[in-house]
């Protein structure tokens, strides 16, 4: 029932054909249950295991590998002799890679969808209802509540369904709905209709929402929505509908896969077509079909060479290592790809309450009257330090610390704060923090009393548990609270009736202490306390006090102000009608104004510096909150999101103002705005959508249930460690210390990780280019195979994989947070860089082919054939005069492939050392800056020697040990790559960067 807040309580009851006294009949309950279903959030039907497995093979790179494996399997069946065993190694290795990749992917997916289930923790297990089958209130399972049920709630209860209030059974009803709306203080509710069809949840003061908590009071309501129809249920539906966005890296790798598949197709077809004339060569027994299959195998080898099989594993490893480094900085990453996405974050949309602020109300200013003579009024103003519930802070007047006990007015102010209060401070020993017990506003007053210490209580030697209420307990020993006149909306105040516990000249007779909204309390004041004496409250003094309060409540502070007053001679309690709350205002008259306190949910002290740092890094910070616009803008000014005098027109919007804009205006508003106030969950998701339409990479922070859909929709969802389980499981990242500063550290780490990823991706790709050039050259020139597929797989996965992973440990650039965010569409390799890595790759390919050719032509242990004979080796037969005296089996020797493989591995190790920096010379940034890289190079070379020397590996990889002279040739062909890359780096530094600057 969407419009329940618009109707009177009687109209809502009529709609459901129910009375508040009798409740629903059993027939009505049965009908409603059939119509609306159970009052619970349905269990999410996740994807089946089979669906998840199939999904892992939708990636283009994976499909290319799968095709290569299937073709290799088919070809392996036709192998004969010694090659039969080794032929199956290649497809088996590829399949093992794909299976491992799928297992990791399925495991991640299984964990990712837990957010929806976490919402269930906000569903209360039991509820209290009135039904016609039994007298009075009965407890039933919350899932059995149906629309139309009369539900009773009291302090401490979790609201079991969305309720329209019909009767408040206490003087006031306050509800903590911060998990749903993000409001930092509990909200006073009433039963009146709200004639505003566009009211947001924060303005629906006659509604109680499922999953929120009753802070004080007792009430009856009629259930108007259950299950998925509740506001909590709508959030669940939004979360279920959100499709996870692919990260910039995933999109780039998809694009890379598409380009690679096209390139592979062209090259493979070209190699096969070029060699059609050789299909019937004697080496194939004159069979055209056998020749076609032979060259098809070479085309498959090309495909294997072109695919960087090790890339998925190396990227996963690098991101996993990055998450460990981030965890040490209090940023726990749940989704691996989001580590890289952090590096291109351009907008951080931050929830205010508990993220930019502490979510711990704190009194930061107070005043008492110093002078109130005819025509003049002077105030004693004080500031109080401390931004949490920790009872430590300093009271200052101007710049000077003061002893509060020296001011009679402050002693009385502290007395009112301590006694006119139903809340307390508590030290949570498990968490090691001070927490509120009761109302946030009243807890702030309790904390203020502890900081003021007006009776100079000796606090040394107290445990933290004892310290939580030491100063308050001293005041409570002097006066005893007899009863409380609860807060009500009409008088906007509450009061306590207190009597002295013992005869004391300072305390004479019973008193009433009052606190409430300044305008309402001051209106009922006839005098003002000046020190220890009482003076009449003149019009001048009244205006002066109200002007100061208005000043605090607006401008850069927007403090929540409370006036504190005393009734020195209250009526006798026997003469007071305490069961009639309409008379309370009569008892709270003829008051003496004592002072005023100003409080706020204070900004975290470290946030302002972080926002400045974000600004320097080209990242826009946008505050999104459920609080009112004035408070939100004031906090923005304190944090530096807005300047002190900056005009916020077009930069700050309420949810309603945002709704009033056309879709295009909403898009433009999201492009410029830095503050959104009074928003609902749907607004947050729309803001993220609009930002994404401008290709902004959005990080959304939050801690409440209301943040979860937007956290899931944003590229980076960041939840607070103290936040709700729903927010945490919808997010990609959780801040264990709830500190906005940790986001900035995580962004810096993300940028460093991306830079390192660029290095190892380019490193791996230059290796693949070299392998493709090698196979393409041997095919075009008609030379024997220099590298076979199983060797290529070994290099791509193992030998190159270790240094590539170690490149993830490269140190970050010093100016990494002084640059704007990189464009998420920026290509991994483009322009000059593409030429650089193509040049390196071509050299790798030429050197590899040259090494194999050298053994045939020049090695004293080789056949020393001519280059012409080598190019026509397929025509070799006993009766061919061109090959007289040459054993044709020499063209199947393992030595040339071993030479080629050794050169490829050695060059790749040199390349890895070159990759410590993209443009800096090895003389400026030597390899030992990354000791992990040196270890990886040593390990890779050790593994290479392993396959050369340890049986049965030489048989599997078709290699053989080399002599010292042969190793000398390998080094001569490999080391020049360092000089080539140094020359290309020199050109980059001195010419290419200058061109960029000119652009």
Swiss-Prot record:
Regulation: Inhibited by sarcolipin (SLN), phospholamban (PLN) and myoregulin (MRLN). Enhanced by DWORF; DWORF increases activity by displacing sarcolipin (SLN), phospholamban (PLN) and myoregulin (MRLN).
Protein's gene: Atp2a3
Gene3D superfamilies listed in its UniProt record: Calcium-transporting ATPase, cytoplasmic domain N (3.40.1110.10), Calcium-transporting ATPase, cytoplasmic transduction domain A (2.70.150.10), Calcium-transporting ATPase, transmembrane domain (1.20.1110.10), HAD superfamily/HAD-like (3.40.50.1000)
Sites where the protein binds Ca(2+) 1: 768, 771, 799-800, 908
Membrane-spanning residues: 49-69, 90-110, 254-273, 296-313, 758-777, 788-808, 829-851, 898-917, 931-949, 965-985
List of residues that carry N-acetylmethionine: 1
Residues of the active site: 351
Entry binding sites for ATP: 353, 442, 489, 515, 560, 625-627, 678, 684, 706
Lumenal-side segments: 70-89, 274-295, 778-787, 852-897, 950-964
Ranges where the record places region Interaction with phospholamban 2: 788-808
List of residues that carry Phosphoserine: 17, 25, 662
Subunit structure, as described in the record: Interacts with sarcolipin (SLN). Interacts with phospholamban (PLN). Interacts with myoregulin (MRLN). Interacts with DWORF. Interacts with VMP1. Interacts with TUNAR; the interaction occurs at low levels in low glucose conditions and is increased by high glucose levels.
Topology of the protein relative to the lipid bilayer: Multi-pass membrane protein
Organism: Mus musculus (Mouse)
UniProt modified residues of type Phosphothreonine: 19, 415
One GO term describing the cellular component: sarcoplasmic reticulum membrane
Name of the protein described by the UniProt record: Sarcoplasmic/endoplasmic reticulum calcium ATPase 3
Catalyzed reactions per annotation: Ca(2+)(in) + ATP + H2O = Ca(2+)(out) + ADP + phosphate + H(+)
EC category: translocase
Function: This magnesium-dependent enzyme catalyzes the hydrolysis of ATP coupled with the transport of calcium. Transports calcium ions from the cytosol into the sarcoplasmic/endoplasmic reticulum lumen. Contributes to calcium sequestration involved in muscular excitation/contraction.
Similarity-based family: Belongs to the cation transport ATPase (P-type) (TC 3.A.3) family. Type IIA subfamily.
Biological processes per GO annotation: calcium ion transport from cytosol to endoplasmic reticulum; intracellular calcium ion homeostasis; intrinsic apoptotic signaling pathway in response to endoplasmic reticulum stress
SMART domains for this protein: Cation_ATPase_N
Species classification: Eukaryota, Metazoa, Chordata, Craniata, Vertebrata
